[in-house]
């Protein structure tokens, strides 16, 4: 993967002069506000900026294409003071916060400096923070909140009653469109989202060759083999996955476009994983977001719990309250069918919501489902399982003495 320039680097390259001029004016107008640690100049009455370095940028997301950001700089400042008719001078280092805004639309537009102030390191961080690459900083515990935020905007009815998400309608409300096309010869890419008009390559099965195709901004490309090889649930998840990229990751791509005009889409590959990586790239974080948030959009927390409880009661009447294995197997099956997701997705969502009993049903290992099994509810802790793949077992055998 080509190296990615940070927002800090882009701002330094594009707007150094504007930042210098605004900071210089502030320093000249406010010498008395400087935090001087000089022995020779303790109360400066004159100050001038020599140079500065950008230490970091605190970036806050905003609606639409705009962003707010604070440029934190370390400045070299020449200060002076008249003491008993003697003119004393010295140089100091002072940190400043330069608050700015800009629009991201085919590059950085409408850059403005809003204010300059002495840096206060104890200033509270804002909500909706972005990384230095303009990727939202979202913790796993916030995924449900982001899903709710998404649904409030594009499908609020799904937050008041259990229902399958009308994926096609959500796409329409977002101003996007879906095009089904085989993206690769060996089905290694299930979906793509296009952030700018461009020409892509698709695989023509009849002629057994790759061909060019012009696609417009806001197009979701989905390989129809997602449906034929898997199920409609995987298709729905793929589409909503791409919607999450559009909803949360457009600003990253606007940043990349400032120095790489060809970076116009995200490709989502089959079995892509960041599990064993020590350091994640911006693309890794974005995939992690979409992988975690999309199922929560398709199965909103409160409505999913409501549906699960309804299905448990229904199946307890059929099997009796003690036949937990059959009850949970049916609940997973019916939950997947109701929300139009895969059985694996339904099971994972139930585990995420605290229904530990489903651990023993629909367990998919080494490309096949294994037999259902039951266990005591308190015998498994977080991140523990009774089933691992053959490759994982070999890894543990060689890497872990206890195993």
Regions found by a protein language model. Give the residues of each.
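Post-HEXXH active-site segment of zinc metalloproteases
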Residues: 233-237, 249-281
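Pan-zinc metallopeptidase signature
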Residues: 2-70, 302-403
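Active-site His/Glu-centered metal-binding helix of metallohydrolases
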Residues: 239-248, 289
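A metal-dependent hydrolase signature that marks the N-terminal structural subdomain at the beginning
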Residues: 1-197
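Short helix/loop segments within enzyme catalytic domains
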Residues: 278-281, 285, 289-320
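Active-site scaffold of zinc-dependent metalloenzymes
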Residues: 179-239, 249-254
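Divalent metal-coordination and catalytic microenvironments
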Residues: 171, 290, 346
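Charged, glycine/proline-rich intrinsically disordered loops and linkers
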Residues: 189-216, 259-273, 313-326, 384-386, ...
